[in-house]
Amino acid sequence: MIDLSTMKQQIETLLNQAIERLKTKGVLKPEVTPVIKITHTTDPQHGDFATNLALTLSKAAGMSPHALAEKIVEALPPSGQITEVEIAGPGFINFFVTEGSYQTVVSSILKAGKDYGRSEMGKGQRVHMEYVSANPTGPLHVGHGRGAAYGACVANLLNAAGFEVHREYYVNDAGRQMGILALSVWVRYLQGYEASIELPKNAYQGEYIIDIAEALKAKYGKQFYHSVESIQAKIPEEIDSNADPEAYLDAWVTAQKDLLGPKDFECVFQAALDSILNDIKNDLEEFSVTYDDWFPESRLVREGLIQEGLDLLTKHGYVYEKNGAQWFRATALGDEKDRVLFRKNGLPTYFAADVAYHLHKFNQGYDQIIDIFGADHHGYIPRIRGFLKGLGKAPEKLHILLVQFAILYRGNEKVSMSTRGGTFVTLRELRHEVGNDAARFFYIMRKPDQHLDFDLELAKSQSNENPVYYIQYAHARICSVFRQLKTTQKNWDRPRGMENLSLLSTNHEKELLATLGRYPEVIKRAAMNYAPHLLAHYLQTLANQFHTYYNAERFLIEDDNLRNARLNLINAVQQIIRNGLTLLGVSAPEEM
């Protein structure tokens, strides 16, 4: 018997056979190649599956959709899994499948276990995913958390759909912000010896900077000490800290490098980078967000990748020189303005690093490359696509997914975040307050491009209104039924239950069976659309249906055949909830 999870393919095969028959009869021309779309119906009165095929082909057939639907239905070969086919509305074709097709899904789930829902849809295809990639200038904040949860879930879904996924974090260990970080740590270190030294206005000011500085002092003593006077002597008098705080900050960074020299500056720099990067790694690992590689920006320079990118763009005629700098002719490829690749001092820009990093990704031969950025990176999209064309790479291989930052609320008060100001709420603080499970689920339960108001009180509540609690509670309730079974004289005979699945005839049972059968399709859709919220919504529906069933029926009944069938059914529900939550990075507790 055909499993419900493969029923759509069976119906598609039947429709293709019907189309070929209509071509033979001259109803359709031989060159007609329809795209057959089959959907689950939302109302059982309209059957189990439906297609709009007649509506899409009516023009080619030269007849009304309803008339063509009649001919398609007449041409359908018989099937033992379909009990009825009807035409609805202007020409929709509805299919009613046998109850046995639904019941078979239980045996399929219990046989496959944790692998149920996995497919080979993406077999042989390699996907590169980059997500989070926050600058290692401070702890991850709650805004980064959404990108982390989303990226990890998309990677899990693609893996479940058969794709080979490479997860990567791009470490921005070069550039201006890292210089400011090293300066911030150094000034805090100096304050341990000379309290009169003030931290520049726009430096990083969080407590974590002080912690790094104290560790530096404990390990190296006064090795990096310089007096206030020696520093001030290095700051040009014409730079006003109030009028131009950024220029003043850059002057401090230059002074630090001059006074410390390359070796000591690198020591301070590396201490700051290692401390923060290790914290980020630990934070993400605790959040079940893992990577195959942490790719440092410095590697681009070390391995000549930036120069390789420049040479390739030059070869294709997209580089020119102006005012001593080297520019990318971005406007010729759809960008709003041309971009500097190398400054007049010979140093590469962030843009040059972006070019080199994407060139490296494309050179690895991936079938898909996925970049997950914050929504504030919207302007990067035409820029990146432009330089890919300039490099001679296929832009269609790149998928840029934008994630709106989550907005955290305490009551009705919005919490502001500022990395340099040090007033942000960290991802770790959020996780400790609401738990990993709630954080993971709340982050992905809406479309990534939708704004997310993170309700702390709801996330912590143990109520039906808390979606992750409600789903986990369904799993725990099923575990409780099987624990109760062990305290009775009754048994659970799984093979006998399989033989009596036809006894699952109540509306609640039919509803659960239909929803269970949709799971493999949900995984495929969620993977192909990079949409973990589809799985989250599915699990909410399944949990709601189970709770309704639990409140309406009893499971540990005297009737052996019905008891075993029902226990098999709820065991299948338990398995699907556990499988789905695992893909979302959420636990499935046995007790709550």
Curated annotation (Swiss-Prot):
Top EC class of this enzyme: ligase
Keyword Glycoprotein: no
InterPro entries, alphabetized: aa-tRNA-synth_I_CS, Arg-tRNA-ligase, Arg-tRNA-synth_N, Arg-tRNA-synth_N_sf, ArgRS_core, DALR_anticod-bd, Rossmann-like_a/b/a_fold, tRNAsynth_Ia_anticodon-bd
UniProt EC number: 6.1.1.19
Organism annotation: Coxiella burnetii (strain CbuK_Q154)
Family per similarity comment: Belongs to the class-I aminoacyl-tRNA synthetase family.
Recorded GO CC terms: cytoplasm
Domain of life where this protein originates: Bacteria
Assigned keywords, A-Z: Aminoacyl-tRNA synthetase, ATP-binding, Cytoplasm, Ligase, Nucleotide-binding, Protein biosynthesis
Placement of sequence motif 'HIGH' region: 134-144
SUPFAM superfamilies: Anticodon-binding domain of a subclass of class I aminoacyl-tRNA synthetases, Arginyl-tRNA synthetase (ArgRS), N-terminal 'additional' domain, Nucleotidylyl transferase
Protein name (record): Arginine--tRNA ligase
Localisation: Cytoplasm
Pfam family, any one: DALR_1
Subunit-structure text: Monomer.
CDD domains: Anticodon_Ia_Arg (cd07956), ArgRS_core (cd00671)
Gene encoding the protein: argS
Reaction(s) catalysed (UniProt annotation): tRNA(Arg) + L-arginine + ATP = L-arginyl-tRNA(Arg) + AMP + diphosphate
One GO term (biological process): arginyl-tRNA aminoacylation
Keyword rRNA processing: no
Gene Ontology MF term list: arginine-tRNA ligase activity; ATP binding
